[in-house]
């Protein structure tokens, strides 16, 4: 039997010691492809098709090597030749197929499906430049293309194409296939569609391009800027390309397995991930009509086949489109949507549940709920809010459709791959069973009283912090003190996630330190976030944080105690460095606004403690670990919802009534900030906080300051107690495995393989 060294040298055609990192990477790509192909299994019974606008899959080499059981052999073979697997990984570009939690969840779900030996493929688009590559200049976010495709991409071109009609014109969707390996499981597929006519050269001045040149631009960017009509139309073009090609793929695959279309629900389960793929419902009905199936039967078939996941409580994210847009882009769908609307209106007199409303807007989520057999939320609190308030009318109409599936994360990437030293310590105590059964982490609980074990885990954290400090210096040009407390808020930049609350805290700390009230421990506050190109206030928050970072660094009194670092172009690769090094995880969204969150789970799994509101999955984390092992603050979701309903929140009252808050907000346009930043951006953010503050930052400010102060004090003054809390968090993280989530989806909704 060949050794790994011999296998790689045969693939490369020369000794490893003489091979470049690029040559070794390509050899490993070939090796993974051949091994993953051997894990493809035949499909019997029902197969899942998970349709999502984004899949934030991250780099794939190490993840695939781990899942295929090759990682240790490859690492050792390379080391023997004086090579480093981490250097080889640098050759690999990160796929630009997603942006935030929605896309990362989809990627975790694909991993778990394959690991659990369940037949389930993804369907999405092959974006060329992703959302954008973020860079900072003059304290401002700039957007550039984020290229990743090359001839050696993991996504392999096929000869399979499907015709798609957009605005009456014919286009040809090309299928690319990307293998998804499971941990000691099967290989599934991520199906990505593209047009051969895409022209990357039309992009100029950052991420500007002609939004009307559909044949050239359709898959260039994820979520093209929708601040104008052309951008909004482009999103509909994208969504229809995805669902039309996807629906044709599903029907073709099912027919090849013996489906006669009448029995489609016995062959396929389709999960609609948020509202972007909603048009798959009318498109499937239209295609079944072309197969000779009458409308009413087609509606029943599609309803029995499709299920919908709601990911948001924010009205802005529940997509609605002007009927005129759909008339132009997908005129072939409008007769179907009109019939569906008429059918829905026969079921209820509640006009608020209509698919087409009185203003001629088409509500995608409404179509999803009416014409799928399942609607799920993604955390217990989120699902209750949907049932009791946001979607209450639908819940009264279809109580049997509503269910909860609390999100999860794949422990292969977020523990085995990104924190191998922690894995080694865990295995030395409880064995390797947790790799396949995350619930086994609970066996760590008795060690929470073992000071020697706690010290070893603490050393792993210290080493990870040193590694992050080195990475920050190498990639960001920033030096940080690895012995300081690392406080991290990394997630999409949005006012409801409240990076602005953290900003006000940091300004407050700046004043406290200048007044001689030094904190219990030096604090390094690390951010990672992209703001949507047209989201002005979000970009102003980034500017304020970057400006504050400069002000603090220039102050000899404050700099030894406080540092603000904003990581440029936050992505999965950066997350894999930051999460294992975190001490305090910031999960501070306004209660009732975060559906679930999954960053909270990743940080917890890697031994960080959570500072958070009772929102999303924070609620379930607190239930798992106990209130004494998490730092909860702020209003409850019911208090927030009541305040919105009363309509009596006036941020000016809080600004005028709290000297510390007023001092922090005034500082945004104080001489120190204006000397380092731009008045237009800082004044606009200040005005927003004083006059609007839609996500109630000000009422939670004092509670946040107090609770964060308690966390710093505990970290500095009771290190043993802090370590104990960290170990308890790790031991209780098993519930948040995406394997558990997927098993629940399968038992309650999909019934795959049956």
Question: Model segments located where?
Answer:
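A conserved ligand/cofactor-binding region detector
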Residues: 1-754
């Amino acid at each position: 039997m060949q050794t790994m060294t011999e296998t790689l040298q045969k693939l490369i055609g020369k000794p490893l010691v003489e091979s470049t990192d690029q040559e070794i990477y390509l050899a490993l790509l070939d090796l993974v492809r051949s091994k993953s192909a051997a894990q493809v299994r035949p499909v019997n019974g029902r197969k899942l098709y998970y349709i999502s606008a984004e899949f934030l899959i991250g780099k794939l080499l190490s993840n695939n090597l781990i899942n295929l059981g090759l990682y240790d052999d490859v690492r050792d073979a390379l080391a023997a030749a004086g090579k480093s697997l981490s250097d080889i990984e640098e050759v690999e570009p990160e796929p630009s197929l997603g942006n935030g939690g929605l896309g990362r969840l989809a990627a975790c779900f694909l991993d778990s499906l394959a690991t659990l030996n369940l037949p389930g493929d993804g369907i999405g688009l092959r974006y060329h430049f992703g959302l954008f590559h973020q860079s900072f200049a003059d304290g401002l976010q700039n957007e550039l293309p984020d290229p990743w495709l090359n001839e050696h991409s993991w996504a392999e071109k096929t000869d399979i194409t499907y015709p798609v009609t957009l605005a009456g014109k014919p286009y040809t969707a090309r299928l690319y296939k990307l293998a998804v390996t499971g941990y000691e499981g099967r290989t599934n597929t991520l199906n990505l569609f593209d047009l051969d006519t895409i022209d990357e050269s039309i992009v100029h001045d950052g991420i500007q391009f002609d939004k009307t040149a559909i044949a050239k631009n359709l898959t260039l960017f994820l979520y093209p800027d929708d601040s104008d009509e052309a951008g909004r139309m482009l999103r509909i073009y994208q969504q229809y390309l995805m669902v039309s090609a996807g629906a044709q793929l599903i029907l073709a695959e099912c027919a090849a397995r013996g489906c006669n279309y009448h029995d489609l629900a016995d062959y396929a389960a389709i999960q609609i991930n948020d509202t972007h793929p909603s048009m798959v419902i009318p498109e499937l009905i239209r295609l079944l009509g072309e197969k000779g199936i009458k409308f009413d039967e087609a509606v029943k078939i599609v309803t029995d086949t499709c299920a919908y996941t709601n990911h948001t409580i924010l009205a802005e994210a529940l997509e609605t489109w002007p009927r005129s847009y759909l008339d132009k882009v997908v005129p072939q769908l409008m007769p179907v949507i009109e019939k569906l609307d008429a059918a829905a209106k026969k079921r209820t007199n509640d006009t608020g549940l209509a698919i087409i409303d009185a203003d001629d807007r088409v509500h995608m989520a409404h179509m999803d709920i009416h014409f799928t057999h399942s609607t799920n939320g993604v955390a217990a609190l989120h699902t209750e809010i949907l049932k009791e308030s946001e979607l209450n009318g639908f819940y009264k109409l279809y109580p049997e459709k509503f269910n909860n599936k609390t999100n999860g994360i794949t422990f292969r990437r977020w523990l085995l791959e990104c924190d191998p030293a922690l894995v080694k310590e865990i295995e030395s105590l409880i064995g390797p069973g947790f790799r396949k059964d995350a619930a086994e982490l609970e066996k760590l609980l008795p060690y929470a009283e073992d000071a020697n074990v706690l010290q070893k885990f603490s050393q792993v954290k210290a080493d990870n912090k040193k590694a992050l400090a080195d990475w920050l210096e190498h990639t960001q040009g920033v030096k940080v003190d690895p012995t300081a407390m690392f406080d991290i808020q990394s997630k999409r930049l949005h006012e409801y996630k409240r990076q602005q609350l953290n900003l006000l805290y940091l300004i407050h700390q700046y004043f406290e330190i200048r007044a001689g009230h030094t904190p219990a421990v030096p604090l390094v506050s690390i951010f990672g976030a992209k703001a949507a190109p047209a989201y002005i206030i979000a970009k102003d928050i980034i500017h304020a944080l970057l400006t504050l970072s400069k002000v603090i660094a220039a102050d000899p009194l404050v700099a030894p105690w406080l540092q603000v670092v904003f990581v440029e172009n936050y992505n999965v690769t950066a997350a894999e460095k930051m999460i294992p090094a975190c001490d305090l995880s910031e999960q501070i969204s306004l209660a009732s606004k975060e559906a679930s969150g999954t960053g909270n789970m990743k940080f917890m799994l890697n031994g960080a403690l959570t500072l958070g509101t009772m929102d999303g999955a924070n609620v379930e984390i607190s239930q798992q670990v106990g209130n004494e092992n998490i730092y909860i603050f702020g209003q409850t979701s019911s208090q927030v919802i009541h305040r919105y309903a009363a309509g009596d929140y006036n941020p000016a009252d809080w600004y005028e009534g709290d000297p510390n808050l007023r001092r922090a907000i005034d500082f945004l346009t104080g001489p120190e900030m204006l000397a380092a930043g731009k008045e237009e951006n800082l004044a606009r953010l200040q005005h927003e906080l004083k006059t609007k503050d839609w996500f109630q930052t000000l009422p939670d400010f004092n509670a946040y300051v107090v609770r964060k102060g308690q966390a710093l004090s505990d970290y500095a003054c009771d290190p043993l107690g802090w370590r104990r809390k960290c170990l308890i968090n790790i031991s209780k993280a098993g519930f948040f495995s995406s394997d558990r989530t997927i098993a629940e989806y399968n038992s309650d909704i999909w019934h795959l393989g049956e």
